[in-house]
Amino acid sequence: MDMVEALQWRYATKEFDAQKVVPAEKVEKIKQAFNLTPTSYGLQPLHLAIIHNNDLKQKLLAHSYGQKQVITASHILVICIETQIDSHFIEKNFELQKQVRVVEDNVIASFRDFLIKDFTNRTDQEIYQWAMNQAYLALGNLLTVCAAEKIDACPMEGFEAGKYDEILKLNEKGLKTAVVLPVGYRSEHDKFAGMKKVRRPLEETVFEVTV
């Protein structure tokens, strides 16, 4: 299956087969794909919480507006954002760059200082929105990887983020819930599985600029 075929195959799964579990090796691929998600400036203000425990799923269901995907999916992926994105966070990222790429401080100092100044001048809301944008980059990446691996998924924005934070103890880790992605395998009873994919015609959404 090529990538376009995989994207044609996928859909927002509304009913998972609760008896089917995503194998550990595929979960590992999901982890790796998440960590390889490109982010603005390469700062990677993201974490991925993976929930397989049924008791936790049941608790999350109570704050997911009754969306049964939360309990029938094999795993629940919760993309989280850092709550403290400041000079220390940026400096820590650049220290990692120095270690991995074996570069001297003077090579990256000007860009690091630019970013520290830029983020210092941003409001908390601007930084929050920037981090949320990165979370959606990760979501798109995970949806594509799941499709390529023939894993069904359903992106969810309908949930009480504060309650998710509380149940998963994200505040203790300096994190907030951004978006939720149940993954697993579609139920044969999911009425949406056989429906044709609806997209606007390509000529309406894509155009070339020649001048």
Where in this protein do the model-derived segments appear?
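Acidic, surface-exposed loops and disordered segments
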Residues: 1-211
